[in-house]
Amino acid sequence: MKMAMRRSIFTTQGSSTFRVMRGMRSVVLARHQPRPPLGKDLDQGHISRRTISSSSPRRVQHIDLKELERLVKEAQERLKKLEDEAGEPLKRTTPLHMSIAECLRWKPESEEDNVVVQGYVRSVRGMKTHRFVSLGDGSSLAPLQAVVPVDTNQAEGLAIGAAVRLTGKWVASPGASQSHEMQVTQVDILGPSDAKTFPIQKKYQTPEYLRTIPHLRPRTPINAALLKMRSEAVAALTRFFADHDFTQTHPPILTSSDCEGAGEVFTVAPASNIAELTDEDSKSKMFFRNKKYLTVSTQLHLEALAQSVGNVWTLSPVFRAEKSDTARHLSEFYMLEAEMSFVNDLDEVMDLAEDMIRNMCITMYESHTVHEFLNREGRVGSDLVPPEEVNARWEGMMAEEWPRLTYTDAIEFLQEHADEFEHKPVWTEGLHSEHEKFIAEHVGGGKPVFVTDYPRDIKAFYMREGQSIPDDTCPGPTVECFDLLVPDLCEIAGGSMREHRLEPLLEAMKRHNIVAGEFTSSMDGNAPTGAKAGPLDWYVDLRRWGCAPHGGFGIGFDRLLCYLTGVQTIRDMVSFPRWVGRCDC
C-alpha cells in the first residue's frame, strides 16, 4: 500500500488507476494514524464506537476493507504493467502538494521527490551551510522540519512569520525529533515578514499577552488547534442533528425583548442617531419605531419555528451586557439551542442533550486534531489543564447513563456536608458555584450530572410548572427543568419543558412582572381578557392556536469547548473575545 501511495499520480488523471490511487493517499495516511489511548478499550468497554445510544438511529459507517484491498491490488498491477512496458520505474512528474499533518504521518520507505508544502515559518536556525526551518500551517501542532541550503534562491527571506512555499525531497531524518524531514530545493516567499518586529516569537508567551493581539493569536499552534477542534465540533453536531431529523434554523440576532427577563441586553440604534437610545419622545424617529436589542437567547423564536417543522436547532451568537469580569463570562458567545415538538416528558429532552454531547465527543475523539491535542508534549502552563485530566473529562463525557437527581435531593445531599461550604445550601436560594462543583464531583464520579426540578420562583417564566403543592419532600412549587453540571466547570447546559398552556403562561408572566394589567379566566378570542404582554405578545400568540407540548435546551458552546480542551479562560477559547471594557479588532 505504501508503494501504491507513492505512485498516486504517475498515470494520467483521466484513468481509473489515477482515481483509485488519488483517493488512497488519504486512506493510507489515516490507517497509519495511531489510535489515541483512553483508559478503557472503547470497543470492549461500556462505550461503543458503533452505536451512539440505544435510542440513536445513527450508525458509524465503515469502509469495506476487502473491496479497498482489491482496488489497491488492481491499481498496483496496472502500474507494474506500465513499468514493464516502459522498461524502468515510473517517476512522478507533477508536484505532490501535502499539508504538514499529512507529511508528518507519511513515512515512505525511500525518498520522495517534488514534494510541496506551504505554511508559516515558526523558527529559523542558521548554520554555516544550511538553515533549519520549522514550518506550520495549522494542520498540526508539531511543525515540519526543513533543511534549506543557504545558497537556495530566496532562502534569505526565511524569517519568523513569513508565508512560504517549500519544494524538495521528503527523506528519512537523522535527527530524533521526527522520522522524516524535507530537504528543500526551492523556496518561494509568498508573504515576507520582519522577524524583529513580528509579535509572536518561538518562546512561551502568556495568554494575557496574546489577548492583546487577537488578530495574530490564531497563528500560534495551540490556538490553531483550538480553531480546528471548534470546526470539528460544529461538523459533528450538524451530522448528529441531521441524523435525528432536526431542522437547522437561523433565528434573528435583533429582537424586541429580553428572553431571560434580566435586563442584561445591548440596545441597538444607528450610529447616526445615538440620541434615540435615551430620548423617550423620539419614538417616531427610531429606526425600528421602538427600542430593539441584541438577542440574549434564540429560544423564543425557536419555539415559533418548532411549531412549523417540528424539531429545530441553531448555533448562533448571543449577547449579554453583564459586567462580570470572570474566566467564565463573555459579552458575545455562541449558544447551541434545540427545541423539540410533541414531547411531554423532561427525560426526553435530557436524553437528547446527553446523546448529542456524547455523540459529538465520540466523533471528535477519533480525529487527528483531538488525538494530537490530548497527547501533546511540551510546556503545560497554568492556562491549560494537564492532558491527563482533560483525557479523564473526555472519558466521562463519552460514558453511558449520566446521573440525574432532583434539586430537592441535591439540597438534602449538600446539607449533609454543609460545613464544607462558604454559602450554606438553602432550598429557596439556588445552587452556588461551590455547590455545583461538589455535586459534579461526588455524584457524577467523573460523568456529567443532571439536576432537575428547580424551585419555580428562581427560574424563568416560560418553564412549565411541575409540582405546585408543597409537601414533606418538596418545600415549594417547582418547574420541569434541568441544569447539566460537569466536574470543575459547573453548569454547561440548561433546559426545560416549556409552558404551552395559555393561562398558566400568563400567570407566570404576571409573577415575573412581564404582563401588564389584569386578566380574567373567561376566554375571548382564545385569550384571557385584559392581558398585555407588550413585546412578548407574539410569544403569547403561539399558545392561542395549536401549541403542542414542547421542550428544549441551550448549551454554552464556547464553555463546552473550554471543558473539552482544558482551556481555563473562555477568553482564550474564542478567537476575538468581547468582555466588559474590551472589544478589540
Language-model regions: role of each:
Residues 2-585:
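Class II aminoacyl-tRNA synthetase catalytic cores and aaRS-like
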